[in-house]
Amino acid sequence: MDDDKGTDTTDAKEGCSGWFMLEAACSDDSDLDNSLEKLFEDGTESDVSDLINDDDTAAQGNSRELLCQQQSEECEQQIQYLKRKYFSPKAVQQLSPRLQSMNISPGHKSKRRLFVEHDSGLECSLNEAEDLTEEVEVPASAPAPAAQGGVGSGHYTSLLRCNNVKAVLLGKFKDAFGVSYNELTRQFRSNKTCCKHWVLAIYAAKDELIDASKQLLQQHCTYLWLQTFSPMSLYLCCFNVGKSRETVMRLLSSMLQVNENHILSEPPKIRSMIAALFWYKGSMNPNVYAFGEYPEWIMTQTMIHHQTADSVQFDLSEMIQWAYDQDYVDECTIAYQYARLADSNSNARAFLAHNSQAKYVRECAQMVRYYKRGEMRDMSISAWIHHCISKIEGDGHWQDIVKFLRYQGLNFIVFLDKFRTFLKNFPKKNCLLICGPPDTGKSMFSMSLMKALRGQVVSFANSKSHFWLQPLADAKLALLDDATEVCWQYIDAFLRNGLDGNMVSLDMKHRAPCQMKFPPLIITSNISLKKEKKFPYLHSRIYEFEFPNKFPFDANDTPLFKLTDQSWASFFKRLWTQLELSDQEEEGENGETQRTFQCTTREVNGLI
C-alpha cells in the first residue's frame, strides 16, 4: 500500500492542481473523440450506465402534477356547465336597428360557443377567419321614468322587453305563488265584456303604491284580496258594478303607476272548488290583506251547507213545476233559463252536473205541454179569457177597437152580437169571415186577438200534410189567415162538418186520430163568399164582415188605431156582461182557483 495520500502537486502549475495531467497520462487511448464514440456505443453495458435510474417508480412530484392537471380539467368543465346554465348568450353586433329589420332572407343569430376548443398550432383552417364573429354585450337600457308607466327597476324592465311579455309574466306568477294563473281564472276574449269580479296580477309595482291601493280600492269594491311576493302582486277585486277589462286596466295602471303590459287581468273561475279554496284559505294568511265579505261564489264552493246541497240528486218534478210556473213550453227556453239558475238553485246545479240533460229537457217540455193542455180543456171560454187577460200588463183603451170597427163601416151592435155567439161556439155560428181589399187591417185585427187570447194559427200552405190542422186540438181560439180560392174549395169539400159544430176526426202526428170539435175559427180572405156562387153551402155556416177601407197611418207610419193586448184586455173587461161571459166568482175567487196547480211535493207555507 502506498504511503502517499493524494496526488503530488509540487510540480503543478500555478492555479492548477495537476490532477488532470496525471489522469490523462493513465488513459489507454489519448484520442478524446474515440473515447466518446465508445462511450455511446457501450450504452448501458458501460461502467457509467448506473448513473441513469431506469426504475418504473415515478417521482412524487410527477403524481402531484397529474392530480393538479385532472382537477383543473374538472373545474373547467364545471365552469362551462355553469356558464351554459346561468349566462345569457351574447347578441350579434348590430350595426343599426333599421338595417337588421331589412333582412331579405331569415337570418339566424349565432350561438355563443360555451366550450373553448384549444388549437394545437400545427394546422390552421382555411375558413377560420370566416367563422369568427365579433360578439358584444347588449347594454341594458335605463329604466323608463314613472310618467311613462315604468316604475320597476332596470333589471325587471329589461326582462320584460321580449316578444311574449305575457308568457314571462305567467312564469313569474307561478314561481311566486306556486300556482298557475290560468288555474284561477277563465278567459274573456273581448276587452269590452263586463264582469264584477276580476283577478289581477301586477308586476314590479312600488310597495308604497300597493299599500295605498288597499284604501283606494275600498270605495270601488265590495271585496278585496291582496297578496304580494316581490315583484308580483295578486289582486281579487269584486267591484260594486260590472267593469270591462279596459276600465279595470286603466284604473289599476293609474293607481299603481305601472304599464298596462305588466298587468294580467281575467275573471275568476266561479264554479271551481279548487280556485275558491285558494282564495278562502289564502285570506286566513296573515300576509294577505282582505276587505269585505266573501263573494257568493266563494261561499257556495266552500261552505258546508252548500256542499251538502250540491249532493242532492236532480228532481225532474221540480224542474217541471218551475217551467209550468214560468209558462215555458219550448225546449231551448227551458234549457237556457234553467241553466241560469245554477248559481242559486241546487236542483239546477244537479241538472247541469247530469249527463242526460237533453233527455230531461225534452221530458220537461212534454210534461208542461200536457199540463197546459189539460188546464185549457178544463176551463170554460170565460175562464180562459179571464186567465189570459189577467197576465197582460199595462193599460189600454177599449175604444180603439170600437173606433176601428166603425172606421170600417161596421155596426158595432151587430158585431158584438155575432162575436158573442162566436165565443160561445154555437153550431154554424162558430166561424167569422173578415174579407176586403188588401191593406185594410184584416190580419192585424185578427192577429192581435189571437195574441191576446193565446190562439193558434193554421196555414193552408201546409195542406199537403195530413197534420196541418193539428194545432186546432190545442186551442181555445184559431185563425186561418189569407184563404185563397183553393183554400175555399178545400173547406167546402172537407171542413163543412167541423163548421157545423159536430165531432170530427183529426189526424195527429205519432198518435191515433183525435175526436174533437173545432174551436171558434176566424178566417181572413180577399174573397167575399156573398159574391161567390160556387160555395152555397158555406153561406149558412160562415158570417162575413167586410173591411173596405185601408188601415190609416200617420206621417211617422204609426197606426192610428192601437190594436194591442192592452186594448183587447180593456175591451173584454168593459164588455164582459154584454158578451154574456160567466161571472168569475162562481168559478173561483177573482177568477182564480183556490190553489195553484202543483206537480211536485214542494213546501207551501212550511207544509208539504
Swiss-Prot record:
Chain positions found as Phosphoserine: S88, S96
Function: ATP-dependent DNA 3'-5' helicase required for initiation of viral DNA replication. It forms a complex with the viral E2 protein. The E1-E2 complex binds to the replication origin which contains binding sites for both proteins. During the initial step, a dimer of E1 interacts with a dimer of protein E2 leading to a complex that binds the viral origin of replication with high specificity. Then, a second dimer of E1 displaces the E2 dimer in an ATP-dependent manner to form the E1 tetramer.
Occurrences of domain SF3 helicase (ranges): 410-560
UniProt xrefs under Gene3D superfamilies: 3.40.1310.10, P-loop containing nucleotide triphosphate hydrolases (3.40.50.300), Zinc finger, large T-antigen D1 domain (1.10.10.510)
Single GO BP term: DNA replication
This protein's encoding gene: E1
Name recorded for this polypeptide: Replication protein E1
Homology family: Belongs to the papillomaviridae E1 protein family.
Subcellular location: Host nucleus
Record note on quaternary structure: Can form hexamers. Interacts with E2 protein; this interaction increases E1 DNA binding specificity. Interacts with host DNA polymerase subunit POLA2. Interacts with host single stranded DNA-binding protein RPA1. Interacts with host TOP1; this interaction stimulates the enzymatic activity of TOP1.
Ranges in coiled-coil conformation: none
Cross-linked residues, Glycyl lysine isopeptide (Lys-Gly) (interchain with G-Cter in SUMO): K517
Alphabetized Pfam families for the sequence: PPV_E1_C, PPV_E1_DBD, PPV_E1_N
UniProt entry keywords in alphabetical sequence: ATP-binding, DNA replication, DNA-binding, Early protein, Helicase, Host nucleus, Hydrolase, Isomerase, Isopeptide bond, Nucleotide-binding, Phosphoprotein, Ubl conjugation
Residues that coordinate or bind ATP: G436, P437, P438, D439, T440, G441, K442, S443
Disulphide linkage map: none
One GO CC annotation: host cell nucleus
Residue ranges of the motif Nuclear localization signal: 83-85
Reaction equation(s) it catalyzes: Couples ATP hydrolysis with the unwinding of duplex DNA by translocating in the 3'-5' direction; ATP + H2O = ADP + phosphate + H(+)
InterPro entries according to UniProt: Helicase_SF3_DNA-vir, P-loop_NTPase, PPV_DNA_helicase_E1_C, PPV_DNA_helicase_E1_N, PPV_E1_DBD, PPV_E1_DBD_sf, Rep_E1_papillomaV, Znf_lg_T-Ag_D1_dom_sf
Post-translational modification summary for this protein: Phosphorylated.
EC number: 5.6.2.4
Gene Ontology terms for molecular function: ATP binding; ATP hydrolysis activity; DNA binding; DNA helicase activity
Region (DNA-binding region): 148-311
